[in-house]
Amino acid sequence: MNQVSLVGNITDDPELRYTQSGSALATFTVAVSHRSKHNGEWQDVNDGFFRCTAWRSVAENAAKSLKKGQRVMVIGKLVQRTFEVEGQKRQTIEIQVTNVGPDLQFATAEVAKSTAEGSAASSAEEKQQGA
C-alpha cells in the first residue's frame, strides 16, 4: 500500500487554483523536523520539505482552513511526476493528499461541517441541524 503520513508546519498559505475542467487544486509545502539530543543538548533536525497536492473538496477546505506556520497532519500517497523545463525532463515526488488537518498536540481547532459545495456551513445552520 502506498500511503504516507506527515506531521509538520505549512511553509506558506495553500495556493488554490482551478483546472480548465473546473477541478479545485491546492498546493502547499510541509516542513518536517524532529528534535534530537546531541552532546547533551536538544537540537531541531530538519527532515525535509514535502510538496503536497490536494484536489476537489480537500483542496477548497485546505485553502480556507490552513495558514502559513500551522502544524498539520497530512495523509496521502507518494506520486512521481515527470515534466519538461526548457526541453529537459525533470521528475519530482509529491504527496497527493487524501486527508489533512490541524495537529492538536499543541493547538485547538473549531470544526465547521462543509456544505455539498465545499464551503463551511454557518454555526447557526449547524445548531438548527443539531450538530
Where does each model-flagged region fall?
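Acidic, gly/ser/pro-rich intrinsically disordered tails
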Residues: 1-2, 17-22, 37-42, 60, ...
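Intrinsic-disorder/low-complexity, polar/charged segments enriched in Ser/Thr/Lys/Arg/Asp/Glu/Gln
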Residues: 3-5, 49, 73
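Core FKBP-type peptidyl-prolyl cis-trans isomerase
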Residues: 4-46, 82, 91
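OB-fold and OB-like beta-barrel modules that bind single-stranded nucleic acids
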Residues: 7-10, 30, 68-79, 97
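Beta-strand/loop nucleic-acid-binding surfaces
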Residues: 47-57
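Beta-rich strand-turn-strand
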Residues: 55-90, 103
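A short hydrophobic beta-strand segment most commonly corresponding to one strand
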Residues: 92-102
